[in-house]
Amino acid sequence: MSAKTILSSVVLVVLVAASAAANIGFDESNPIRMVSDGLREVEESVSQILGQSRHVLSFARFTHRYGKKYQNVEEMKLRFSIFKENLDLIRSTNKKGLSYKLGVNQFADLTWQEFQRTKLGAAQNCSATLKGSHKVTEAALPETKDWREDGIVSPVKDQGGCGSCWTFSTTGALEAAYHQAFGKGISLSEQQLVDCAGAFNNYGCNGGLPSQAFEYIKSNGGLDTEKAYPYTGKDETCKFSAENVGVQVLNSVNITLGAEDELKHAVGLVRPVSIAFEVIHSFRLYKSGVYTDSHCGSTPMDVNHAVLAVGYGVEDGVPYWLIKNSWGADWGDKGYFKMEMGKNMCGIATCASYPVVA
């Protein structure tokens, strides 16, 4: 074994051990600041392989913050190269004075193609919403709304490396509806939807739609609790048990395709609504503010990610939707993001629906 190989192996062991230490926040604006002995070890170890630069120190802080583990030096160098590209995108975007900011997160060492494979579902044609069934009334809408303040929104979850966003959007809507109807919280099974809802044009880790998931649950007689049917993030055989049902769906209500006025009425006066939109490459690095981008599409065949609209408001003069994601609480603004309202931005009102529970 060469001296270089021995050094590389030792460095990787130190990197992994130090990364398992205290969870330290990442501040890409000041990558040189050393805040713990564990971080100092990571910085020194990574620098031995990649050299000395601000990018290298930023990368070291990133690996420490997110507990990244690489198989060998070659993979570390590859991930560093990708990280540099993403860091440059973050910095160049944030200099433009836009209504939102990007930031380093757990996806900063992934290519766009890798991210697509693990986080996004295949585009779904949500034709069920061409003619909506939501009834708009004359009731006055609140100027702002945040269903979290009513205590009915369940905690942010993490879909992991499975394109099952549609299941988390579905359970998020059902958990909120259940809490609203019965005055208590519940956690429902995403894995049952991954494994069992295929007959309703859903594809497990390859994507699906909340509207179709609601129809499956209605036909099936219910959805099991998370405790009874826990999430694995893999396509498996169906293990539904009627005795473990946590909620039943009486009906589902669709928002007319692209009708943000209907969506605002539903979110403002009824409850959180399952929605879908097109994620493009910059969005995965969202950190704060109101996201907007003219490059994303808004047709039924563009949308590739399902989420949950839990409110709306105005920030610095820009109206927005408040949305719960399923990429963990470390992503974005504690697992949430804001999307510009009024332009069907990225198709935010293209595939919207909500359930009626029992």
Swiss-Prot record:
Active-site residues, as the UniProt record annotates them: 165, 305, 325
UniProt KW Ubl conjugation keyword: no
Main location as per UniProt: other
Matching PROSITE patterns: THIOL_PROTEASE_ASN, THIOL_PROTEASE_CYS, THIOL_PROTEASE_HIS
Region (Interaction with VSR1): 22-42
Propeptide cleavage-removed residue intervals: 22-140
Catalytic reaction list: Hydrolysis of proteins, acting as an aminopeptidase (notably, cleaving Arg-|-Xaa bonds) as well as an endopeptidase
Biological process per Gene Ontology, one example term: proteolysis
Keywords (A to Z) from UniProt: Disulfide bond, Glycoprotein, Hydrolase, Protease, Signal, Thiol protease, Vacuole, Zymogen
Bridged cysteine pairs (disulfide): 162-205, 196-238, 296-346
An MF annotation (GO) of this entry: cysteine-type endopeptidase activity
Subcellular compartments: Vacuole
Sites carrying sugar chains: 125, 254
One Gene Ontology CC term in the entry: vacuole
Signal peptide residue numbers: 1-21
Expression (tissue specificity): Expressed in leaves (at protein level).
EC number: 3.4.22.16
Superkingdom as given in the UniProt entry: Eukaryota
UniProt KW Transport keyword: no
Induction trigger: Induced during senescence. Strongly induced by ethylene and slightly by abscisic acid. Repressed by cytokinin and darkness. Seems to be not affected by dehydration.
Family: Belongs to the peptidase C1 family.
Oligomeric and partner information: Interacts with VSR1/BP80B.
Described purpose of this protein according to its UniProt entry: May play a role in proteolysis leading to mobilization of nitrogen during senescence and starvation.
Protein name: Thiol protease aleurain
Gene behind the chain: ALEU
